Regions:
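Well-ordered beta-sheet/strand-loop patches within structured domains
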Residues: 1-215
């Protein structure tokens, strides 16, 4: 969402969790849950959340694993200072929308079982993971699957890109960042960038394992 934008940074994915708990961030507890608790003291209980008292009188809130969990069945972890990650979602119908800026900064994955199997096969090719094998793990207990070799993650923000069919795609600038980029391209530093792009050689190399659509 424009009010909670996804940060731009690079890191390395180290593991994934099947059947994750969702530890609700303090900002969401304060801004979204406490007002609803004032209206209905049983609000969290009705949704299956666990409330854990903390020292100093505060509370921690978490949602147990399951089909209603806000993270879905899988979350993909690359520990970072922004507390964001990739994850499944129980509201898969939102992927049918043309505009999908609904999150608090994390990125939702449309086909998490396929994505998990692909990543695990990249780092552990002898294990022969399949989406079916991943789904067989779904349950009520967390399962950590660590990568022997971390996988690089680069989160970018693009409002124009070329799709797999070679067609130019344009998206709305929901974060309002295009103006700054256009200004950069028009100044002297932009000339340097144009020179780099003009002399760059295109690369047609494909990854060894095909990454599924829907991320």
């Amino acid at each position: 969402k424009p009010t909670t934008p996804t940060p731009i940074f690079s890191n390395a994915m180290q593991f994934l969790i099947v059947n994750p708990y969702w530890n609700v961030p303090p900002s969401i507890i304060k801004k979204e849950m406490l007002p609803k608790l004032k209206e209905d003291p049983d609000y969290l209980k009705k949704l299956g959340y666990e409330v854990i008292p903390q020292h100093g009188g505060g509370i921690a809130v978490r949602q147990p694993p399951g089909e209603r969990n806000a993270l879905g069945w899988i979350k993909f972890m690359f520990p970072n200072d922004h507390a964001v990650y990739l994850h499944d979602t129980p509201t898969r119908n939102l992927f049918a929308n043309g505009k999908r800026a609904f999150s608090h900064g994390c990125q939702r994955v449309q086909n998490p079982d396929q994505y998990a199997a692909t990543l695990l096969n990249i780092t552990m090719p002898n294990e022969h993971y399949t989406p079916e094998k991943i789904r067989a793990m779904y349950g009520r207990s967390e399962i950590d699957l660590k990568f022997p070799t971390p996988i690089p993650v680069n989160i970018t923000y693009q409002t124009a890109f070329v799709d797999d069919a070679g067609k130019l795609q344009i998206r709305k600038d929901v974060y309002g960042r295009d103006a700054a980029m256009i200004a950069l391209l028009r100044n002297s530093r932009g000339k340097d960038l144009e020179n780099v792009v003009a002399h760059a050689q295109p690369s047609y190399a494909r990854p060894r394992a095909e990454i599924p659509q829907g991320v």
